[in-house]
Structure formats: structure tokens, C-alpha cells
Amino acid sequence: RNYLQEHDKDIDKLLLTGTVCYQKLAPVGLKLADFANRFVGEEQHSWILKKLSGYGETDKSWLTNDLEQIAKVNQDPKIIAGYDNIGVTTIWTADYGLKQIEKYACQNPDLPILSLSGADDVKITGGAKGLLDTKQTLAAIGYRRIDMIEFPNMKHEVLNEIENELIYQRILAFFEEDE
């Protein structure tokens, strides 16, 4: 969503999946991450950042209900075990930017925005409360065409869920809709 700050005029529609909610502790996290980067090193793994952020969990069951997809993730040699300090800093910086309303130019207020999330993805989306906050923030920025859909019995990676055909059908319908 930070891309919208200066580039919403460059896109016709915006699709969000597994829509991330704003973390109220992001400003504090940024200060801690800055401290860790300076004193431990950007490429190191700070245990306190890992603990506070939750980034680097080995349990991947929050991703999807599809056990085959989780097995693929667990067997993928390219999956990182956790984020280094600069990685956590980047995530918290992006999260912090979600609420910096004054930085959004909102040059395309009629931009159609569709958010597709799993109802069981409370950790990332913040659940109904987090999604409502996201919608209200987008509206405060100036966007008028925001549709938030939660799919029951789905987790974070709705594109990799067991019933993902429902997601793909909704995506196709969104992009085929006329303005």
C-alpha cells in the first residue's frame, strides 16, 4: 500500500491479499531495530527483535490450511529461517508508512481497491478490527472505492488455500469489471 503514496495514478486497480494491518508498536519497533542495527549489525539476528516481531517462527501453519503447501514451504531450501535485523527494520518501516496519511498524494481517489483475506488470518490482518482500520485509513487518505472481503476458513495465503478457486474467481471478476 505504500506504493500508493506517489504512484496510485499509475495503476487502474489495486488487489491486496493477506492484507497487513498496521502494528501500533511499529514506531517503537523501529527504534529498537535501529539500536540493534547499530550495535549488533544489520545482517545479524537479534533475539529481541525476533521475539517482539514474531518474524522467524518455524511453525508455518498460519499460512494456509493446505498441508501440501505447508510441506512445500518446509522443504523449500530458499525459505529463510528468519529475518535479519535490517529485514525486520524494512518490515516495520513499511508498516509504519501505512499510517502516514500525509504522505499519500491520492491522485486517483476512484481507484478500485479489493482486499481478499482469510477470516482465520488474524495474526497478519488483525481480523475484522484490523481490516476495518485498513479500510478507514484508505478512506481517510481519500480513496472511495474500497471492498474488503474475508473468506471463512482461510488463513494468510488465500491464493494457496484448499478452496483457492473461490479467490481466483473473485480476482478475475474484479479485473474484468468495467470502471
Task: List PLM regions with ranges.
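Short, conserved loop/helix-junction motifs that constitute active-site signature segments
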Residues: D8-K9, Y104-P109, I141-Y143
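A general structural detector for well-ordered alpha-helical segments in enzyme core domains, enriched
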Residues: G130-T137, I167
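Conserved alpha/beta-hydrolase "acid-adjacent" motif
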Residues: L111, D120-D133
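Short, solvent-exposed loop/turn segments at secondary-structure boundaries
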Residues: P27, T125-A128, N160-E163
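Short beta-strand/loop motif that positions the catalytic acidic residue
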Residues: S115-S117
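Alpha/beta-hydrolase-fold enzymes
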Residues: N2-Y83
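Catalytic active-site module of serine/aspartate enzymes centered on a nucleophile-bearing elbow/loop
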Residues: A139-E179
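Active-site nucleophile elbow and catalytic-triad environment of alpha/beta-hydrolase enzymes
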Residues: D84-A105
